[in-house]
């Protein structure tokens, strides 16, 4: 929760985030603001016509118009400042300064209440960072909040449902995650959005790892690698999970002989190297602790997921 040091912002619990979003929901006032400004302009114009022949009051309409222009200018400036702050939060999240970004996004939720688009982007940042920090129950709250405000068949809603399924799987609620994934799989397979298909493939990989179905995961390893490409650097998580599956089979598969186990181990190393070229090993393990056996030597990633705070 909030701290005087932005790098020490503690991620909220699911209950804290739910309460924060309930207290500061988005409010669509765009139409009201537009009609209010129009009414003020009409009032100023009418006042000008009424007082145009009154020397003592001739300047009042002009002053009213200047005041209206100042108000509209202030509103536009505030909107630009909020837009810049939201963009900055995204930039911080992309360079993995998670706690600083999370603290700023937390403050933006009430600040952006009257700007639904910016409000939604701030909540999206919160959901993303909570997932990266392994706070999956809280991430589910954020994803659920966003889903409730989109049509069920909206492309973004489908992606949010996939991410929520991943959060459920990572928090150990395998049945809930499996059910959520089955519900979205049909729509994802018929979608022309490659990112959505890649997200579903990633979710299935997470599911295979958490249920111990390593052989199923590697049976289509090459297709999975290709399918993950639209995710950009986040494909590294998929490469890491595939590497883990090969690693476990190289050590535990009773049907594999020594040469086969060596091949499995080599494939695991190649995939892990590919993953760590995109995302630091410590960050991969922080997001998916199951990957810890792939660290050489095994270390505690809790202190290295983010760059050191600037002095």
Predicted regions and their residues:
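Structural motif corresponding to the intra-repeat A-B loop/turn of tetratricopeptide repeats
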Residues: 95, 133, 171, 211, ...
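"A position-specific structural signal for the A-helix of alpha-solenoid helical repeats
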Residues: 83, 87, 118-125, 156, ...
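Amphipathic alpha-helical segments of tetratricopeptide repeats
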Residues: 106-111, 144-150, 182-190, 222-230, ...
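Hydrophobic alpha-helical transmembrane segments
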Residues: 50-65
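Cytosolic juxtamembrane N-terminal segments of multi-pass membrane proteins
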Residues: 1-31
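Transmembrane-cytosolic junction motif
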Residues: 27-29, 67-96
């Amino acid at each position: 929760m909030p701290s005087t040091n932005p790098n020490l912002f503690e991620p909220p619990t699911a209950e804290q985030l739910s309460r924060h979003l309930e207290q500061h929901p988005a409010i669509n006032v765009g139409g009201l603001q537009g009609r209010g400004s129009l009414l003020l302009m009409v009032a100023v114009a009418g006042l000008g016509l009424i007082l145009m022949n009154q020397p003592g009051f001739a300047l009042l309409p002009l002053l009213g118009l200047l005041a209206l222009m100042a108000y509209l200018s202030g509103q536009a400036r505030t909107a630009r400042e909020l837009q810049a702050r939201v963009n900055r939060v995204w930039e911080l999240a992309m360079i993995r300064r998670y706690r600083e970004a999370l603290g700023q996004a937390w403050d933006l939720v009430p600040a952006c209440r009257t700007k639904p688009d910016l409000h939604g982007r701030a909540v999206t940042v919160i959901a993303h960072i909570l997932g990266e920090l392994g706070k999956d129950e809280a991430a589910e709250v954020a994803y659920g909040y966003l889903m409730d405000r989109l049509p069920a068949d909206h492309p973004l809603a489908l992606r949010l449902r996939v991410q929520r399924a991943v959060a459920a799987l990572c928090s150990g609620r395998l049945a809930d995650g499996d059910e959520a994934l089955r519900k979205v799989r049909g729509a994802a397979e018929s979608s022309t959005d490659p990112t959505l298909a890649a997200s579903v493939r990633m979710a299935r990989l997470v599911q295979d790892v958490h249920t111990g179905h390593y052989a199923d995961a590697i049976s289509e390893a090459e297709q999975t690698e290709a399918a993950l490409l639209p995710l950009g650097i986040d494909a590294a998580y998929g490469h890491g999970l595939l590497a883990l599956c090969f690693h476990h089979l190289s050590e535990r598969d009773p049907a594999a002989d020594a040469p086969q186990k060596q091949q499995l181990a080599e494939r695991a190393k190649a995939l892990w190297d590919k993953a760590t070229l995109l995302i630091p090993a410590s960050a991969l393990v922080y997001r998916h602790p199951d990957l810890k056996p792939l660290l050489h030597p095994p270390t505690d990633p809790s202190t290295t997921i983010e760059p050191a705070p600037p002095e």
